[in-house]
A protein has these predicted regions:
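N-terminal pre-catalytic "stem/leader" segment of glycosyltransferase-like enzymes
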Residues: 1-98
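Membrane-proximal helix-turn-helix segments that form the acceptor-binding/catalytic region
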Residues: 131-152
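Donor nucleotide-sugar binding/catalytic pocket of nucleotide-sugar-dependent glycosyltransferases
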Residues: 147-191, 196-197
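Conserved donor-binding/catalytic core segment of Leloir-type glycosyltransferases
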Residues: 191-223, 235-236
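Glycosyltransferase donor-sugar binding loop
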Residues: 232-251, 267
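Nucleotide-activated donor-binding/catalytic signature segment of Leloir-type glycosyltransferases, i.e.
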Residues: 248-272
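Aromatic "clamp/platform" in nucleotide-sugar-dependent glycosyltransferases that forms part
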Residues: 288-290
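A charged, aromatic-enriched C-terminal amphipathic alpha-helix characteristic of glycosyltransferases
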Residues: 330-333, 337-391
Length: 391
C-alpha cells in the first residue's frame, strides 16, 4: 500500500464518532503509514441528531457526499493510483456509486483498492433499517457496493455468516472487534476509581430503541426491586441527547419507573460526562437484540467497570466465551444472578476485552496492507472459526 485514503464519519460530541478519527490516526502514525484524511463538510454545527437514530440522516448524507466530492477531486487530479487504498469506515456512504462509474472508465493504473467496514444494515434483522422500512433499497445498495469493492470488513464471525447468507460475493474479513483507543478513553477521566469505592450503580448505555430491547432492562429493574434482600442499587440509563425512542411505549414505561424512583435518567451527556458516570459505576448492562460487539463494552472495561451482556450473536466472541459476564438470553433469573455477583467484585479478567478491541485498527491495517489472510472468510468451512476464542 503506497497511500491510505481514510473516509471517516462525521464527529458528534455524544457519539463514538467524536473519537474515531483520532483512534485511527494514532495507529496510522504508529505504523508510519502515508495517509490522507478525506475531509467532509458538516451541514450544521448544532451536533444534534434530529432525524434518525444513530447519526442525523441529513447530516450523515451531506457529510458523506461532500467527502466523495473531495475524493473525486483528488482522483481527477491523478493523485491516486493502483497501489493506493480507499478505506470507508461505513459501508453506507452516500455518493459511493460514483466510484465504479469512474473506475470502469479510467486506466487500471489509477484504480485504487477499496475496502468498506460493515456496521450492520439490512443483513441484520434487528437493524433500524427494518424499523423504518428501508430494507428494500438498502439491500440493493449493499449488492451494488459488494459488486465492486476489494473487501468487506465484518466485526465478528456471526456478521460474516449474515453476509454469506445474503449472497455477498466480495472478499469478507473478520476483524473481530470495533475500532477503539483504550488509552484515549482512559485519559478522559482523572483516574480509574477503585471498584470498592464505586456506587452500586448499573448503567444502560445503548439507545432507548426497540432493537436495544429496553423492555428487558426495565423487566430486570422491576424484578430486582420485587425480590427482598438484594443490595440497594441505582439503575440508570445514559443518553447523549434528550432521552427518546423509536417506540413510544418504552417512554411511557420509563416515566413510570422514573416517578417510582426505580430508574434514573442521565441525558444530554457529552463523552466525558458519560465516562465519569461509568467510572463511578459497577456494571454496564446490555440486552440488545442488535449490537455487533458494541463500543460500550470496551469503554466500561477500560474504566474499571464490570460488563454483563447476553450470550447472543457477537457477544460470546467479544467476551471470549466468559460464562461469568454472559447471561442466557433472555433469562431474568440468570441475568439477576450474574448481576448480583458482578456488583460485589471486579471480574478477574477485566481489561482483556478492551485490550483486544484496542488492537482492532491494527488488524484493519494488516488487511489494507495485504497481510490479513488469517482473517479472510471465503472457504466453505469458514464457520470453523466460530468456536475459536480470540484472546
Amino acid at each position: 500500500m503506497r497511500k491510505l485514503y481514510y473516509m471517516g464519519l462525521e464527529p458528534y460530541k455524544a457519539r463514538y464518532t467524536l473519537q474515531l478519527q483520532d483512534w485511527n490516526e494514532t495507529v496510522f502514525k504508529q505504523r508510519k503509514l502515508d495517509y490522507v484524511i478525506v475531509p467532509g463538510e458538516t451541514l450544521s454545527n448544532d451536533q444534534a441528531i434530529v432525524t434518525g437514530q444513530v447519526l442525523d440522516a441529513h447530516g450523515r448524507t451531506y457529510f458523506g457526499m461532500s467527502q466523495l466530492m473531495n475524493l473525486i477531486k483528488m482522483m481527477k487530479a491523478g493523485e491516486l493510483n493502483s497501489e493506493d487504498v480507499i478505506y470507508f469506515e461505513d459501508m453506507f456512504q452516500p455518493g459511493i456509486e460514483s466510484l465504479p462509474y469512474i473506475l470502469k472508465q479510467i486506466d487500471p493504473s489509477h484504480r485504487p483498492r477499496i475496502y468498506v467496514r460493515c456496521l450492520a444494515q439490512s443483513i441484520d434483522p434487528d437493524d433500524f433499517v427494518h424499523v423504518w422500512g428501508m430494507q428494500d433499497f438498502m439491500g440493493h445498495y449493499e449488492k451494488m457496493v459488494d459488486s465492486f469493492v476489494d473487501g468487506v470488513l465484518a466485526t465478528n464471525e456471526e456478521m460474516v455468516m449474515h453476509m454469506k447468507i445474503a449472497g455477498w460475493k466480495a472478499p469478507i474479513y473478520n476483524i473481530s472487534g470495533l475500532a477503539f483507543g483504550k488509552s484515549e478513553v482512559q485519559s478522559r477521566v482523572a483516574n480509574i476509581k477503585p471498584f470498592a469505592d464505586r456506587k452500586y450503580r448499573v448503567v444502560f448505555s445503548a439507545r432507548w430503541d426497540q432493537e436495544k430491547q429496553p423492555d428487558f432492562y426495565m423487566d430486570l429493574i422491576e424484578a430486582w426491586h420485587a425480590q427482598p434482600g438484594l443490595e440497594e442499587v441505582e439503575f440508570c440509563v445514559c443518553s447523549g441527547s434528550s432521552l427518546k425512542s423509536n417506540n413510544e411505549s418504552y417512554m411511557k414505561r420509563t416515566r413510570e419507573l422514573f416517578l417510582a424512583g426505580k430508574l434514573k435518567i442521565y441525558e444530554n451527556l457529552e463523552k466525558n460526562d458519560y465516562y465519569n458516570i461509568v467510572n463511578d459505576s459497577r456494571v454496564v448492562f446490555n440486552c440488545a437484540l442488535q449490537d455487533w460487539v458494541s463500543n460500550t463494552v470496551s469503554e466500561a472495561d477500560s474504566l474499571g467497570c464490570n460488563v454483563l451482556y447476553p450470550a447472543y450473536r457477537s457477544f460470546p466472541e467479544t467476551f471470549s466465551n466468559d460464562p461469568d459476564r454472559l447471561y442466557i438470553p433472555w433469562s431474568i433469573e440468570d441475568a439477576m444472578d450474574k448481576l448480583e455477583a458482578l456488583l460485589d467484585f471486579p471480574h478477574p479478567r477485566m481489561g482483556e476485552i478492551s485490550d483486544r478491541n484496542d488492537s482492532t485498527i491494527d488488524r484493519i491495517c494488516d488487511i489494507l496492507e495485504g497481510k490479513g489472510e488469517d482473517m479472510l472468510r471465503m472457504t466453505t468451512d469458514y464457520r470453523k472459526h466460530t468456536r475459536e476464542s480470540k484472546f
